[in-house]
Structures are given as C-alpha cells and as structure tokens.
C-alpha cells in the first residue's frame, strides 16, 4: 500500500513539473455599469442602477513533448466567485483536446452567437433564452477541435452525464447518469471567397429518463461575410425538447 502511494505521488509530481515548464500567466478584467428602466413609475423599476464585473486568469505554456496548453479560470458576480474554467491541450497537427467547465469552447456551443455584433450579443441584458443552443450544457465536457484543412474545421463535444456539475480533480458529480450528449460544429471558410464563413452545428441528448418520450435535439446554420469594416451575418437555430408537451424554439438572428 505504501509503495502504491509513493508511485502515485511521483507520477503527480512529474505531471505538475511538465505543466509548469515555460508557463505564462495573464490577468484580464472588465466591468459594466447600467441604468435600466422597466417603464411606468419609479415604484415599478426600483433601483435602476447595476454593476457587473469579471476577472479572467489564463495560463499558457509548452510541455516537454512540444505540445502547448492553456488553462483558464473566470470569476464573475459581485462576490467574484469562480464562474467557469477550462483546460486546452494543443497537440500540433493532431488538433486540440479540451476539458470544459462552463466556458463553452467545444462543439455546438462555439456557434451560439455567430452573427456579427458591435458590442455584445443580440440577447445581452434582456430577458429570454436567445437561440437556446447549449449542447445540454458545458459542464465537465470533453472536447476536440481539428486543425483547418482547406478552410474546413470540426469541433466535437461529449457530455457523459448531463446532470453533472463541476468537480475538482479526483471528484465526481451527478446523482447517477440520466442522459448523455454528443454535439459538433463544422465551419468552412472557402479560399475562393475571402471573408465568407459557413457554419453548421448539431446536438443530440440521449435521454434515459422514463418521464421523457424522446431525445433532445439542437441544430443551427450560419453564414457570415466580412469585407473591411463591413460585417454581415445570418443564423437560424432550432431546439426541440423530447419532453411530452414541451414547446420547441426556432430563432433567426441577423
């Protein structure tokens, strides 16, 4: 038993040393002050002033085998609690592996807001669900992104247990597996039309709950064109719940 513990500690020390080589850390942040009027009298609105802020910590480096890595932690809210974190390992020409806890860096989540914006997404700061794309969430998701081949690239995401929450290393979460999800995003930037980008994404959640009749599905398609200072785009999305009697969601953005 003691021998096994020593082996585990040695392996852990080796992995930590590998990740710490040539590491750089950056700190960024932003803040937003708002005035919101709900209409009617002041009694309807209450205090119209609001403040939100975020701080992000990103660490990058190179491992002994030449692969590069990036670790990210985001803090948000008035108490600056941990909001999201992720790990990405770029394996040269073999693509990028990722582990996501709330960022949305793989699969259909990368297409949530494909239309150009001058400030924030179209649904920023308003009620409603936007296009509702989330690939059954982005907590404890395994991802893979391929290199670009002739302008064509693929991003895959696998969510082994949709009911899970973020866990520290060595931990588990979720009260037993009730559903799993696989989703992907394909983007294509043809070299013959500079500035044009086409995108397609699909998601399917295999639901094992008896209360749900069918699987949940998501689909989105987008087209964007950039020429100098001009940026135009159009995106259509469809989200369908397998729950009996549940309404679907169809959204157009431009």
Where are the predicted features?
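Outer-membrane beta-barrel proteins
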Residues: 1-254
